[in-house]
């Protein structure tokens, strides 16, 4: 073992453990044989310090995320062959799913979220996302703030999980549950102003005490003046923003270049002569999601919304 690489040592230990169980006729399973992908917002999160996991569930499994066999798969297969009844053989390995390259295209249509909101739900008090019949996606809380000659501090308690704060449509701050952030300094306001808090739900903690992982703003939103007085904000308009292609598709899209500072849907289309698996390069990505709709025709037309 001393002359082998770390990966080779791990393989030796794994295969040795499997062989020992097979020699003793012990049943076992591999976690994971194929990890795959957690699509949408179905990813989990670690506990106690909230840490959402990515949508990739590859797990360095014998069958990788895209369904291809790995050297690990072949090694496990070779081991299992030794324990087959005489005359039996393992089934042949299926061919890999074909892959294709998508032609270059632009996300050249834009629908600004604040211009495309659904009908709001009215709530006296702040409530979690689940209270508004939504389990994942994003949710927008909106209320009106009174005029103030001085700066004030906005205190958001337990925003789960990633919040953007806007005042009269202008973005003031981003608050992350991962970093324990929850306060924003508000500038003086000459008149009543619109406060928007857009909260995105990320992975849910799925074990232990953290299993009751409500999303949205789960406790309260308060306004603190310079003299220390704290007021709980009431009278909210709440907008459900689900992770749903039809919701994103039925928006007013237009050619527009000045939306960088606003949450928005960006749409582009491309045409394929043949279909196959493909992969998005997310190296320059920041925050968001990708939805894809396939129009079956000849050739095939795809619409991508991010």
Across the structure, where does each feature detected by a protein language model lie?
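Active-site region of glycoside hydrolase catalytic domains
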Residues: 1, 6-10, 16-26, 38-42, ...
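Single conserved hydrophobic/aromatic residue that forms the stacking wall/gate
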Residues: 2-13, 295-306
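Aromatic/acidic polysaccharide-binding cleft in carbohydrate-active enzymes
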Residues: 16-70
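An acidic-aromatic loop/edge-strand motif
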Residues: 35, 64, 72, 79-83, ...
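A cross-kingdom feature marking solvent-exposed beta-strand/loop segments within repeated
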Residues: 72, 150-151, 161-191, 297, ...
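Flexible inter-domain linker/hinge segments
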Residues: 84-133
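Extracellular and analogous surface-interaction loops
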Residues: 140-150, 157, 185-190, 267-276
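Aromatic-lined ligand-binding clefts that engage carbohydrates, nucleic acids, or primary amines
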Residues: 151-166, 270-293, 297
């Amino acid at each position: 073992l001393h002359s082998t690489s770390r990966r080779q040592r791990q393989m030796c230990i794994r295969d040795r453990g499997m062989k020992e169980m097979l020699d003793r006729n012990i049943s076992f399973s591999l976690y994971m044989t194929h990890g795959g992908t957690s699509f949408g917002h179905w990813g989990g999160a670690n506990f106690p310090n909230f840490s959402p996991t990515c949508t990739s569930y590859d797990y360095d499994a014998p069958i990788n995320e895209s369904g291809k066999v790995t050297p690990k798969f072949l090694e496990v297969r070779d081991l299992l062959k030794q324990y087959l009844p005489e005359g039996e053989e393992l089934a042949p390995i299926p061919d890999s799913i074909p892959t294709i390259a998508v032609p270059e295209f632009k996300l050249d249509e834009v629908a600004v979220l604040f211009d495309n909101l659904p009908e709001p739900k009215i709530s006296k008090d702040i409530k979690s996302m689940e209270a508004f019949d939504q389990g994942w996606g994003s949710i927008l809380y909106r209320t009106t703030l009174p005029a103030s000659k001085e700066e004030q501090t906005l205190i958001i308690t337990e925003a789960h999980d990633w919040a953007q704060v806007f005042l009269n449509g202008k973005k003031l701050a981003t608050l992350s549950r991962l970093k324990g952030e929850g306060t924003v300094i508000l500038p003086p306001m000459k008149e009543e102003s619109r406060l928007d808090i857009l909260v995105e739900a990320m992975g849910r903690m799925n074990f232990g005490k953290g299993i009751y992982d409500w999303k949205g703003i789960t406790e309260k939103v308060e306004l603190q003046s310079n003299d220390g007085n704290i007021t709980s904000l009431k009278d909210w308009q709440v907008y459900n923003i689900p992770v749903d292609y039809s919701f994103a598709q039925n928006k007013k899209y237009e050619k527009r270049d000045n939306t960088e500072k606003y949450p928005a849907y960006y749409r582009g289309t491309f045409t394929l002569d043949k279909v196959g698996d493909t992969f998005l390069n997310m190296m320059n990505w920041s925050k968001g999601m990708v939805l894809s709709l396939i129009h079956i025709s000849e050739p095939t037309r795809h619409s991508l919304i991010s």
